[in-house]
C-alpha cells in the first residue's frame, strides 16, 4: 500500500536528490518546476513588446 516513504531509504546524489519520482519531496519539486516553467512562459508572452506594423493602413 502506498504510504509516506522515508527519505533515508533512497540514496540519491546530485540533481536526482531533488528531482525524483520516489519521494514526496522529489515529486513536489518536479511539479513546482513544471508550474514555474509554465508561469514563466505565460509571463514572457504577456509582457513582451507588441510589434507595430511598419505602414499603417488608412
Curated annotation (Swiss-Prot):
A Pfam short name: ATP_synth_reg
Membrane topology, as annotated: Single-pass membrane protein
Modified residues (N6-acetyllysine): 16-17
Key words, A-Z: Acetylation, Membrane, Mitochondrion, Transmembrane, Transmembrane helix
Segment forming the signal sequence: none
Quaternary structure note: Component of the ATP synthase complex composed at least of ATP5F1A/subunit alpha, ATP5F1B/subunit beta, ATP5MC1/subunit c (homooctomer), MT-ATP6/subunit a, MT-ATP8/subunit 8, ATP5ME/subunit e, ATP5MF/subunit f, ATP5MG/subunit g, ATP5MK/subunit k, ATP5MJ/subunit j, ATP5F1C/subunit gamma, ATP5F1D/subunit delta, ATP5F1E/subunit epsilon, ATP5PF/subunit F6, ATP5PB/subunit b, ATP5PD/subunit d, ATP5PO/subunit OSCP.
PANTHER family tied to this protein: ATP SYNTHASE MEMBRANE SUBUNIT DAPIT, MITOCHONDRIAL, ATP SYNTHASE MEMBRANE SUBUNIT K, MITOCHONDRIAL
Protein name (database record): ATP synthase F(0) complex subunit k, mitochondrial
Organism of origin: Mus musculus
Highest classification ranks of the organism: Eukaryota, Metazoa, Chordata, Craniata, Vertebrata
Amino acid at each position: 500500500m502506498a504510504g509516506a516513504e522515508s527519505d533515508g531509504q533512497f540514496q540519491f546524489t546530485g540533481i536526482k536528490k531533488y528531482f525524483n519520482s520516489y519521494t514526496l519531496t522529489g515529486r513536489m519539486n518536479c511539479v513546482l518546476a513544471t508550474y514555474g516553467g509554465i508561469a514563466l512562459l505565460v509571463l514572457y508572452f504577456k509582457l513582451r513588446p507588441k510589434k507595430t506594423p511598419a505602414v499603417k493602413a488608412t
